[in-house]
Curated annotation (Swiss-Prot):
An example Gene Ontology molecular-function term: aminopeptidase activity
Name listed for the protein in its UniProt record: Probable M18 family aminopeptidase 2
Sequence similarity: Belongs to the peptidase M18 family.
Cofactor(s) it depends on: Zn(2+)
Organism for this UniProt entry: Stutzerimonas stutzeri (strain A1501)
GO biological process, any: proteolysis
Name of the encoding gene: apeB
Amino acid sequence: MRDELNQGLIDYLKASPTPFHATASLAQTLQAAGYKALDEREPWHTEAGGRYYVTRNDSAIIAFQLGGKPLAEHGLRLVGAHTDSPCLRVKPQPELQRQGFWQLGVEVYGGALLAPWFDRDLSLAGRVTYSRDGRIESQLIDFRQPIACIPNLAIHLNREANQGWAINAQNELPPILAQIASQESPDFRALLADQLGREHGLVADVVLDFELSFYDTQPAAVIGLNGDFIAGARLDNLLSCFAGLQALFDAGPDETCVLVCTDHEEVGSASMCGADGPFLEQVLRRLLPEEDDFQRAINRSLLISADNAHAVHPNYADKHDGNHGPKLNAGPVIKVNSNQRYATSSETAGFFRHLCLENEVPVQSFVTRSDMGCGSTIGPITASQLGVRTVDIGLPTFAMHSIRELAGSQDLAHLVKVLGAFYSSAELP
């Protein structure tokens, strides 16, 4: 089972270079498993025992199965994750011609580690909006092949490189696509129109706009002398999206279970498709149109916010609190912060710990050093939006927000097992 899950994650990462592709891949898998697509613009006709999903902006998705028990009396089991990851996104008018090279201007999305983006074989993917026969349409594209790179400056020309070098995102990050003659004027929109034709057989009249991201073409892999690790891009947080989906498929039929994967977590979640927007609440209110039933159900529910945790690094162990150093392959991590950067309470932490113990899943705890700041997740945002009890957890990870992150090869199975047990829990605290 462990190897099968790890390979499934690797395949999902390859199919998901952007939040749009990550959402489309989840939707395709749900559809194949018998889940029915719902349209927010149309009336919904749901029933007990039904399994459904709905997307927003092509970059966020909520999937749910409706159990046979009244929601107002038994609540919902919710798992939350996010589809976005730090990356380099193409600017609206990106064309640059410098020293005989065609480059694209990029904007840094989220808190990316920038140095690892140099000297990588990069491709480009995302969503393109275009007009065709008088209609405005959108399609996802993925060049798949290495079409760009950001070469480093040789150390002979930058002797201080190994003593620390501040990267100027405006000047130093535009990837090189091609070498061009002085009289050439490359047209990026024409390139996108050509890709639409090659990938989808479409003839676009005008490419109107796009949301495109560069990504590393090196595929994820199980690595290490004994296969102890999974290395890959976007483990934060597609690992949790994938684990939540597998757990949803493992859930028993009696409880109402929800998987919510929102966009824009890396930039604050304040959007129509982010956790700080109305997406989840609006979906739940369509399932519970009566206000009293809605309030009762929320107060009987629990959310597991799943987002990667910082594993203690052997070369930088002093960056962790001495008593709270999560280890790879030692199970999911309960994340705690007194200043509510995480939404965990003693009650929700105790429930999750008990769930792990009952299902023989190892569990760990994380709190930041008292002299360091702490990141956050969708947990506090969703808890404050809905008033739902929440526990923040995640799998331990190295190199978070790098172009290539590292997690333990045993931990995915641990997470799927405990999330599946949560979805099937007859009683919540």
